[in-house]
Amino acid sequence: MTTLLIAEHDNASLKDATNKALTAAAALGADVEVLVAGEGAKAAADAAAKLAGVKKVLLADGALYAHDLAEPLAALIVSLAPSYDAIVAPATSRFKNVMPRVAALLDVMQVSEIIKVVAPDTYERPIYAGNAIQTVKSKDAKKVITVRTSTFAAAGEGGSAPVESVQAAADPGLSSFVGEEVAKSDRPELTSAKIIVSGGRAMQSRENFAKYIEPLADKLGAGVGASRAAVDAGYAPNDWQVGQTGKVVAPELYVAVGISGAIQHLAGMKDSKVIVAINKDEDAPIFQVADYGLVADLYQAVPELTAELGKLGK
């Protein structure tokens, strides 16, 4: 048996999600090979080769894989699939687009967002916004799996796997790149941030996010998140959304400001190591999962907290 892990990367380096998905892939009990597909992605492939537990790295380097189009990548994975018993990828936005296509082309059922490998054919995954854990046994000869990486430790270095080039698959011609707008920020990306400060609908405006949430995040060296309600109201961009329909995070510290704690939001952050909630409603559901709670007006409490951090030299 051999498992193929699809790497999440930016060509220059691997994303943390890849290291964590490798831990899940290794738990299947088979040799793990890693596919790095991109343009100018040799550095990412070399990084994958250094990960402990990787037997071989496949590098598909070409313009076809430059812009994360799902159809060409799915076609490449399917062309490699006969050599593997399982195909694994982190459950990132990119692979939520790619892996269902792979499963459909292979005519198998995808097992989504697993949080535990019970056996090579049996997995646990959250359902009902994380309120129940479902055990799934796959009878498909070839497994297609995405991994909720927040529940797995990152694999370390220590390997020296060979890097082998593979040819690009035929372009299905089903999509073409038109353009992209990339959000640039000096703050940590949400899924890899050790500290996150998130704001909810109580922030009331985009300006208040900039006035209250962002200065606190800057003092803590944190990523900035938002609830779905805040994003839907236009107070924060989509890529800040934390929750079942946004990003699932598990930082060392999660600070929820003006977030009531809807079940959809809790599903995306309840695995955080320490949760701090600031809300003037003492009955807000967020306090049920918080390790520390402050019942206070955020417009008074957050500036005071930011100022105190400043005194500490943050």
From Swiss-Prot:
Superkingdom in the source lineage: Bacteria
Known cofactor(s): FAD
Protein's UniProt keywords contain rRNA-binding: no
Keywords, in A-Z order: Electron transport, FAD, Flavoprotein, Transport
One Pfam match: ETF
Residues that hold FAD according to the record: 253-281
Assembly mode: Heterodimer of an alpha and a beta subunit.
Protein name in UniProt: Electron transfer flavoprotein subunit alpha
